[in-house]
Amino acid sequence: MLDPNLLRNEPDAVAEKLARRGFKLDVDKLRALEERRKVLQVQTENLQAERNSRSKSIGQAKARGEDIEPLRLEVNKLGEELDQAKTELELLLAEIRDIALAIPNTPDDSVPVGKDENDNVEVKRWGTPREFDFEVRDHVTLGEMHAGLDFAAAVKLTGARFVVMKGQIAHLHRALAQFMLDLHTEQHGYSETYVPYLVNHDTLYGTGQLPKFAGDLFHTRPLDEEAESSNYALIPTAEVPLTNLVRDEIIDEDDLPIKLTAHSPCFRSEAGSYGRDTRGLIRMHQFDKVEMVQIVRPEVSMDALEEMTGHAEKVLELLGLPYRRMALCTGDMGFGATKTFDLEVWVPAQNTYREISSCSNVGDFQARRMQARCRTKADKKTRLVHTLNGSGLAVGRALVAVMENYQQADGRIEIPEVLRPYMKGQQYIG
């Protein structure tokens, strides 16, 4: 959520920044609502003061033996007017809040201006795509060769965009996740965290999935609609529970940064992606991801974004997978991001780079929703923290990249050296 003071006092400046990302802020409506809020606020305060004064007069008149009935009727009338004004003010504030919750974050001035993914800017490349002297197989074909990817079984069990992994492919998938967790905890300073895969609506509001993206989530529907679990949804990413761990907290600045990582399944409806990436593991309703989250002081958040992106890059480099870093343009960034870097890994069968990590600085956008604050021991005044999140990495897409980049002419898959300790020293699948 944006700073309400900015929306009140500098709506034109906010509108200009939001226009860079293709969002039209209705400044006239905001101004009209703000003027009405001021009127109602003053009216409510005046009515409250008048009622208090008249109530005090009742006691004084009673002490003098005067007839208090006219005063009592006047106080009752003032009370009714006050209740009506309060109700109107509450409804207006709710309308303003609903509008504010639907407004995306403003882009940082360093973000390239653009309309969509075609306007993203390549920042760097690492590694050279391998040249094959045989016909490249995609990961689906390789998975079927090794009886490791069974999409038909998943359709029978659930439906489209799910997979059953088996045998050595399932083992490789697990090895990737374990390698990522070990790297982030042992070398990058993150604390491993296990989180619930179901969260309540307050948690989803905190990180910005609600109210705008309710359709992208899988919601629980218990038989008893009054049950607490009717307020649950499956997590679209571990960012959601990890970041909300600091909701309604005041953190000593000496304890920052807080760096957390978690391996979890992620659940997404993929609304709006009908017909895209229907083959294979690229776009699934359920997929595993190792997530990184940082909670930092505001003045260091851009440095933290560079650090976090570097942590995701290190995973790819140790796996020997060619990639490129893309600075997302204003029109392609996520709802809550003020700046985002995507990492795209080389996928030989598609002869292109595909997203495998997205690292974002969210600024104080989530912290304001969550009321996550920090302060120094010497200063009682609090301020909002900045939050960052990043994929370190999407495990299924990493599996795709390893299978395709390390395939051999005979169909075997070479296991990257850094993964062999997790595969009992095995060098090849097949």
Swiss-Prot record:
Any Pfam family hit: Seryl_tRNA_N
Record pathway: Aminoacyl-tRNA biosynthesis; selenocysteinyl-tRNA(Sec) biosynthesis; L-seryl-tRNA(Sec) from L-serine and tRNA(Sec): step 1/1
Binding site for ATP: 268-270, 355-358
E.C. code: 6.1.1.11
GO cellular component terms given for this protein: cytoplasm
Gene3D superfamilies assigned: Bira Bifunctional Protein, Domain 2, Serine-tRNA synthetase, tRNA binding domain
Molecular function GO terms recorded: ATP binding; serine-tRNA ligase activity
InterPro entries, per database record: aa-tRNA-synt_IIb, aa-tRNA-synth_II, aa-tRNA-synth_II/BPL/LPL, Ser-tRNA-ligase_type_1, Ser-tRNA-synth_1_N, SerRS_1_N_sf, SerRS_core, tRNA-bd_arm
Residue positions binding L-serine: 237-239, 291, 391
Record's catalysed reaction(s): tRNA(Ser) + L-serine + ATP = L-seryl-tRNA(Ser) + AMP + diphosphate + H(+); tRNA(Sec) + L-serine + ATP = L-seryl-tRNA(Sec) + AMP + diphosphate + H(+)
Domain notes: Consists of two distinct domains, a catalytic core and a N-terminal extension that is involved in tRNA binding.
Subunit structure: Homodimer. The tRNA molecule binds across the dimer.
HAMAP family in alphabetical order: Ser_tRNA_synth_type1 (MF_00176)
Job description of the protein: Catalyzes the attachment of serine to tRNA(Ser). Is also able to aminoacylate tRNA(Sec) with serine, to form the misacylated tRNA L-seryl-tRNA(Sec), which will be further converted into selenocysteinyl-tRNA(Sec).
Family per similarity comment: Belongs to the class-II aminoacyl-tRNA synthetase family. Type-1 seryl-tRNA synthetase subfamily.
Official protein name in the record: Serine--tRNA ligase
Originating organism: Enterobacter sp. (strain 638)
Gene: serS
